């Protein structure tokens, strides 16, 4: 039900327009990556509790969950930092500033009221917390921004369980503030994700939402807005189902790694025999034009991919002008990213 574009979606649109322009040129090209996400990035995580429900997970634990190398708390396979460092081959170093708990102005029930338009009370709560941070002299200057001054990542962790059904109140979601929240020196906040903390912390959803905000990654599952459900690329990407273990989500798929600039080696296929390793970001590419191509990687059921449905070569068909709402499998209407299935039965679609 949340329809307004976020800042990361706007960044993707700019990239897609550039790809469409490139497609008008004659000839076959290696598809150029979108804006790369490499180097040091720093995001923000605001901890929120309520007058009638205090936070039970200490700030120090959340800091370790976000940043500590080799973190094992609650059975997680590393920290958020570890996840992005590993899947990027060390090319993205993403750390997070975690605030002290902010106590909301009203009881939890006010913000979870299912009768209020979805997102409204979440935005109210986040803006309360931001105003408190700003008035207290918080230093926003160290947070990473895009070229228009928008801070990439604003995470809100709130105390306790999620008391709502899907599409209500504080049900976990990512969206954008009604208007940019100015914090000085041309910096502003707009995109956010909000999640309940529960009794323990888990990597999967947090990493997925930061994949949106930091890397401008799209969802590779089907929103079913056309009332036809499909499975996108299934468990073969963080930005789709991401595996069956919330504490050890699967890797980002080859398409998005390539777009983010995380490839170690890209080989354009023409003819001959080629070898590709499973423990590196090495990809084969067979391009049709700058926005449509096959990209191939070797995936193995171990480490971050331990819950994959299978091992071997994963062949993705990419049409960067497509959509994962397009489950018709026609020549004119493609998925943005589809996993080719050996039996040809289109089970994922």
Feature map (PLM): residue ranges:
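Sec-exported extracytoplasmic/periplasmic mature domains
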Residues: 50, 131-138, 212, 216-220
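Active-site-surrounding "flap" and adjacent substrate/cofactor-binding loops of secreted or lumenal enzymes
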Residues: 54-92
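Primarily auto-inhibitory N-terminal propeptides
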Residues: 1-63
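Short, polar loop/linker segments at the starts of domains and inter-domain junctions
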Residues: 56-69, 250-254, 326-337
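Intrinsic-disorder/low-complexity accessory segments
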Residues: 1, 44, 304-349
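Active-site-proximal segments of metallohydrolase catalytic domains
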Residues: 26-35, 78-185
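Extracellular hydrolytic enzyme modules, especially secreted metalloproteases
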Residues: 81, 153-310, 316-321
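Soluble non-cytosolic domains of exported or imported proteins
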Residues: 56, 119-124, 200-201, 205
